[in-house]
Regions:
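Acidic and generally charged, gly/proline-rich low-complexity regions
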Residues: 2-183
Length: 183
């Protein structure tokens, strides 16, 4: 994420890595009223009433560990009725961050490496990059919130029922069929 694209985010809270210590640092975020409308538009939901995030960040050398919880009150449009309905989300967050150079070194294969792809389900995700010595907690909040949204939200109690099949109009060839049968 570049600095210019961070300016367009509706909810941005950059945090300098130097301010994070070995002991966990608590950071609480809450979107203001003006930010909520922009967040709703950004996420493609009908409205956002509340957005709060509580994070705990700790540092181990150049790496940063982030854990926390996002709480959001939103309105999404039902895919069946198109009516807005309330949605409460509680999203757990757990991420590791590392400097960009360290991530690039991890991704660069050496000449001795074989091309052997093995996917392990219990393998941890690679760390997120620390860009220019900062971590944007607003960006983290928006990403995890977007991933937690139901892509096909359905209002509770609403069921989709297929429309009744239309009775086909009488074919022009039906008259020929009747003539052939002698009716």
């Amino acid at each position: 994420m570049t600095a210019s694209s961070q300016d367009t985010l509706p909810f941005s809270h950059p945090l300098r890595v130097e301010t994070i210590t070995l002991r966990p640092v608590a950071v609480d975020l809450a979107a203001e009223q003006g930010e909520l409308a922009a967040v709703a538009s950004f996420l493609g939901v009908a409205s956002a009433e509340a957005l709060k995030a509580s994070y705990s960040l700790s540092r181990n050398g150049e790496r940063v560990k982030l854990e926390g919880m996002i709480k959001a009150s939103l309105h999404q449009n039902c895919v069946v009725t198109v009516d807005p309905f309330p949605v409460e989300l509680n999203v757990p967050v757990k991420l590791d961050f590392a400097p960009e150079a360290e991530i690039a070194a991890m991704a660069r294969p050496s000449e001795d490496d074989e091309i052997d792809i093995e996917v392990l389900m219990n393998e941890e995700d690679p760390p997120e990059p620390i860009i220019d010595g900062t971590i944007d907690l607003g960006l983290v909040t928006l990403e995890f919130l977007a991933l937690a949204l139901d892509p096909y939200p359905r209002k509770p109690g609403v069921a989709f029922s297929e429309p009744a099949p239309e009775t086909p109009a009488e074919s022009p060839f039906a008259a020929l069929l009747q003539l052939k049968r002698g009716e």
